[in-house]
């Protein structure tokens, strides 16, 4: 969790990732998909920044672009003030010890032919950490920390439940003692009962190892449970960023308001005004001009249709990309 003296660990500046693709057999002109479009975000050391949005909005692409698992089109990724995108292959290889990822599907991300010990110890062997005996001791220790017994070391992934496999994935990601971890839909494939256990495990490991998380999810309830601050994405751009309490009590962007209105209330006697968005999400091949949300926004004006809104601060720590945010509060 964040301390009072917050320090920015990672920051993106106008980070973009564009893909080129052909629209069809007869259309030979390649089109550009702006999966991530000039995103500027900061993540403070020791905090969890939740990243939410509908499927296809660019959340996972942003996380993987930050880690250089896929190349960026333009922009910067500053880690302790240094641009990761300027690193050569050798320097980036060394840096990867500090940057890790927990994947969504714990089964497909684990090699079915490797034992639990081989899976977790692989990063230690790649970076030549310790002797064989020391590596085994480290693997046994991290396995117990994630709630699994060392008797499982010689078993294979298919012998475990989804929750247990994700614990193995977490152990593998944390074995090198990283500083920054991208959690890419890390609990979305799990049953609800197991999901809470894994979330609590991740919070405990964060406090114990002073980790910083970028927690990617489409589930606002899950993000609320684990995050300190939350960023909302729409069609490759950031719509709103705010501390958790502010975002849920006083959302300023119409898209955020619509998302929050869809969350069920635990008290059946309470009612919340549901905001129904008209139309479908525009195609990433041909996004709207101006504000990308204007085609579904009930408050859109001519300015919204023509001018791209800038992510600006309206309250302390609360940023929103909306021309009419002050009027709609």
Across the structure, where does each feature detected by a protein language model lie?
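Short catalytic/signature loops enriched in Gly
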Residues: 5-8, 21-27, 32, 243-329
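Helix-to-loop junction immediately C-terminal to a conserved catalytic motif
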Residues: 67
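Conserved ABC transporter NBD signature motif
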Residues: 75-83
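Conserved ABC ATPase "signature" region
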Residues: 83, 133-151, 257-261
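Conserved ABC ATPase signature
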Residues: 156-160, 164
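A short, proline-enriched helix->beta-strand linker immediately N-terminal to the Walker B motif
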Residues: 175-179
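P-loop NTP-binding/switch modules centered on Walker-like glycine-rich loops
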Residues: 182, 186-190, 194-272
